[in-house]
Structure formats: C-alpha cells, structure tokens
Amino acid sequence: MALKELRIGTRASQLALWQANWVKSELEKRYPDMTVTLTKIKTIGDKILDVPLAQVGGKGLFVKEIEEAMLRGEIDIAVHSMKDVPTEFPEGLGLYCITEREDPRDAVISNNVKFADLPQGARIGTSALRRQAQLLKVRPDLEMVIIRGNVQTRMDKLKTEGLDAVILAAAGLNRLGFADQITELLPTDLSLPAIGQGALGIECNLSNQDVKDAISFFNHPDTSRAVRAERALLWRCEGGCQVPIAAFGEVTGDELKLTGFIASVDGKVSVKGVVTGPADDCEKLGVKLAEQLLSEGGHAILAEVYQREVSREKEIPV
C-alpha cells in the first residue's frame, strides 16, 4: 500500500459527514498506517436553501465545488450520495466505486398515519419532483409542499410548517439513526426511487492508480450494475437530478431487472416500463429502457418539464 495519506472531500451536511466519516473509518480499518482527513466543502445546493432545487436549475448542484477542489489537487476522493451525482464528469475525474446499497425506498414520516390513510387534501413535504409526481398520480388531492434543508430540518417541518407527512429517503434516516421515526416505507411500485438512491459513490482522479487501488474494495458489483443501469437511463433522457425521472435496478444472480418512470410534475401524464437482461449489459439495458419510455410519451413530457425549468431559471439570481 503506497499511499500514506488520503484526503476526502465532502459536503458539510449531517448526512454527508456521516457518509464521509464511514468511508474514513473503513479506510482506517483497512490501512491502519494511513492518515485519512476530511475537507468540508460548501456547494451551491447547500448555499441556496430558500428556492426549490428544480428552480435553481442545472446539474451537479451538490458536487461541482467538490470536483473543482479535486481538480485543484486539494482532495484525493469525494464521497457522494449517488442520487446527487450527474451522469457526466469533468475531464480526468470519474466514479470509481459504488458502495452496497442501503434501503432504496422512500419513507413516510407522519403522526403515525400511513400514506393510504392521510386525509383528503393532506399537506406533504418533499424535496423531489420525482416523489411529487408519483404521489400525485395516485392521490391528486394532496398538497405538495417543497421543503429544503438537512434531514433533521425536514423532519422538524412536520410540526413547524403544519404538514401531515414528510417523505424522505429511508437510507439517510437509517444512516443517521432515525429509523424509529419512520411511519411507513413506500413500496417501489408506488414510489420508484431516485437514480442511485441508497448507494454512495466515490469519485477520484482516474489517472491516480494508487488512490484507485486504495478504494477499490468499496465497490459492490451488484449495486454497481444496478446503479449504472439507472444512470444510463438518466443519461439517455438527458435528465438532471431535479426532474421527475425515476429508475430502480435489481440484480438477481446474473440477471438485471430495471424499472423506469417519467412523469409530468403534477403526475397527470406519465410513462412506466420494465426491461430485463444480463446484468453485465447494465448500461445497454438502461439506454434501451430510456428509448422505450421516450418513444412512448416520455420525450414530450420532458420537453415540457425542461421548458418550465428554463423559464424559471431566468427569474432566479444565483
């Protein structure tokens, strides 16, 4: 093991620090003589908290500044929530490891009221257009309230903003020790997860073989294939993290099942599909499903979503 030091770049949120510290701890266990340090970096997604992410626009809202630090040689690796990682990287950088997935489902936090039992016109807090579209599809009576901030802040808004429920990723709640706050886990056929939800990604300079050798043990092959399929679908749809596109890959043996979903923001128009095939062909399967969804109405849906996004971007000073 040639490396004596490894510098990790991370956002400063509670969840991001948990994730980065987990990577740090695993590295220290594996390489007791290595010095592992954390550098906290504020991203544009962290700085703009009073505007819904979909209105901020653009891609890489939670990674761009971290990648810039890597390009300047200030950090060696970056730890990301996979659902925040764009499908394209700056030249020389790339995703080298995808960790084993935590629970990929969405979780309901409420006053012990399950989703199906929420009252007519219930106010639901969420940060994702993907969730909003899918839940409105089955419950058009709901009022969606866009909430921002870290996990604890969003949970607190159940009371501070008079919400009936808050929808968050189960993975983050589990990692931070909030599993006991979950009222219900939504099945994936009701709320298909975000691309990469529940998995962590480790990005590095792809020319640094010592760093790649040091972190390679983090990669979980089945999760990697599933997430690569999901990301290929997103790439083919030219989608960012803040559009109503969802995908979920499941690997069983050598087979991959990929489910994808594209919807209008209000959930009134949507298209959903499934493909299966060899797990080693994960990215081809992702592109195949994307093209199927686009041809069945997804292209028109996304054109309208992106047009709305562009018009809103012009109104927001960043």
Curated annotation (Swiss-Prot):
Pfam families in the record: Porphobil_deam (PF01379), Porphobil_deamC (PF03900)
Organism of origin: Geobacter sp. (strain M21)
One annotated Gene Ontology cellular component of this protein: cytoplasm
Pathway: Porphyrin-containing compound metabolism; protoporphyrin-IX biosynthesis; coproporphyrinogen-III from 5-aminolevulinate: step 2/4
Gene: hemC
Keywords from the named record: Porphyrin biosynthesis, Transferase
UniProt-listed PROSITE patterns: PORPHOBILINOGEN_DEAM
Protein name listed in UniProt: Porphobilinogen deaminase
Role description: Tetrapolymerization of the monopyrrole PBG into the hydroxymethylbilane pre-uroporphyrinogen in several discrete steps.
